[in-house]
């Protein structure tokens, strides 16, 4: 399951691009099937909300953004000189068929896909994954393989692994989130793979309010998430090393699941004697 997606595009036809560049904040550019409304952005000088109508309902599909201006040495052009444009899908679009409108919207705007900038993959289960994961890490009889290396000194600090607990005043460890990162991602998740396991139902009820996710699953009473955050470098390396092609407009669930488990196991896995303990087992995909 995709939980976050940002795709970098190349402007191959500047007609609409040049016109939306002229919009002031709050102004709208009408593409008939959808609209672009310019809004304030944090890192990009040009940010537009993509809106279209579904019957009587207005759908916030995502954001189109370009012209990075608030970081050092921004790179806003492809090697051929064409402008870079990014589209980030609204989270709710990923839990409906709205995501399949990406190809139509990009084509209408004169954009060609270039690469995936960020991709969050997740698998939701009716059982808690954080607890058995922590138990495996703490079990002295189990060898932890962290970022491809067997951990020999169990007393050495491991900044790659962190635990966060929350809950009530009387029970502050009611919920536990486990984060495991590649070393390059410890300070900046844009530089490596990050794994997170947590109570998704509690997160929705207590903070995010993403009720559409619960509706997507039929309003379960228990929902736990395992999530992998990937950046362009990891995705490109994975695809190139296997001679695979990522279809930006038709999601290949088998490819995504293989990519998901590959990166989970590349960051952390376990061995008990001669037995491998991998994420496919933790998440119920293998016995």
Residue ranges of model-derived segments:
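Structured, helix-rich domain cores that form ligand/interaction pockets
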Residues: 1-286
